[in-house]
C-alpha cells in the first residue's frame, strides 16, 4: 500500500471524540465563509441545525452534512486539501458531491478564503513534500509506481475490458465505456493516418490497449514504453495472449532515454506525469525522435491558461495523495514550448472535455459498485473514500471546464528553430 494514502494533516493528532476549542473556532469561520456563496444553493447541517445559503433559484444544489466537528479543524488548518482528508476520514457527507464541487468552483472567492489564513501555513509543508517528488529519472519511476502499481487487479475492477485509463469518446448517449475507449483509440490512429506496415512509437503504454488495438486492427507495428512494473507485466501478457509479439515491441524505458527515428508517435494522457518543469524536455525529445514530416498525436489534460501559473506551483490533494509529481499542461504552455524548443507545428486540436465528465461518472459508478472487492484487495475505507473524492473532484472540474482534455496533432517541419 502506498504511503501517499496515509491521510495526515497538521490537525490529525487532535482527538475526534470530543469537541475542541479549534473545532468551534473553525466552525465559525466555515459558516462565515460559506455565507459568501453567491452561485448555487446549499443546505448545510451542523449539530442538528440547518443553514440555507446561496441562490435559492439556482438549479445547482446539494445537501451537506457535517458528521463530526473535527471536519472544521481539518478544513480550517488544511484548506481544501483538509476537506478532502476529512471526507476520507468520514467526517462529512453530501447527497451530490459533484454539485458541491461545481458550486465551489463557481464561487472562487469562497475557495480562496478556505486556502488562506491559518490554512496557508500548510502550504510550505505540502510544497516541501512535493519538491521531494520531482520527476527526475528515478523520481518519475517512484511517482509512477505510487499510482499505477497499486495493483492491476485494482484497476481491472472498475476500468472497462480494454483497461484504458484515459478519456473515451462517446459516439452517442448509448455508447458503452468500452466502445468509447475504442473510439478514442481510433480517433488518434486516424489522426496519424496509420497504414499497414507503419511503425508507431507510443510513449506511455498503459495496460497495452492502444498498442494491441493498433497492431491488430490496423496491421501496423508499435514500439511502446512504460516505466510502471505492473503495467509492463500486464501488457507483456496481453501482447502474448493476442499473438502480437511480431508487431508490438514493449520497452521499460523512460521517454528521455528513447532513441531512434519514427514517422509516427502517440502519447495518451502520459504528459500529466512529466511535470511542468520537464515539458520542454518532453516536446524536444518527441521532436528529435520524429522524422521530417512525421506526425505526433497527443491526448492531454489541460488547466485553464489564466490560472496555470498559480496552479503549477500549488499542491492539491491529487498531488499529495493520488498522483505524486503530476501536473496538467495548459494550451499556452504547449504553444510556447513548440515555438521555443521544437520543430513541431500544431495541425489539429479536438476538444473532448465533455466526454471526460461522462468517463469519470462511469468509472465512479464502477468503482463504488466494487467497494467490497476493492476492500478484499487490502485497501481500507479511507483509501476508497479518498479515491471516490478524486473521481468526483475531476468530474466536476471537467463539467465546469476548470480543466479540459484535448487531442492534438503535430507535424515536424525541419528548420523552424533558429
Regions inferred by a protein language model and the residue ranges of each:
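Feature captures hydrophobic
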Residues: 1-181, 187
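Conserved class I S-adenosyl-L-methionine
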Residues: 197-206
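Conserved SAM-binding loop of SAM-dependent methyltransferases across substrates and taxa
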Residues: 207-218
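Conserved SAM-binding loop
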Residues: 235-236
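A short acidic, Gly/Pro-enriched loop at the edge of an enzyme's catalytic core
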Residues: 256-265
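A short glycine-rich, Lys/Arg-flanked "PGG" loop and its adjoining helix->strand segment in the class I
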Residues: 280-292
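Conserved beta-strand signature within the Rossmann-like core of class I S-adenosyl-L-methionine
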Residues: 293-301
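Substrate-binding/catalytic lobe of Class I Rossmann-like enzymes that use SAM or dcSAM, i.e.
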Residues: 302-418
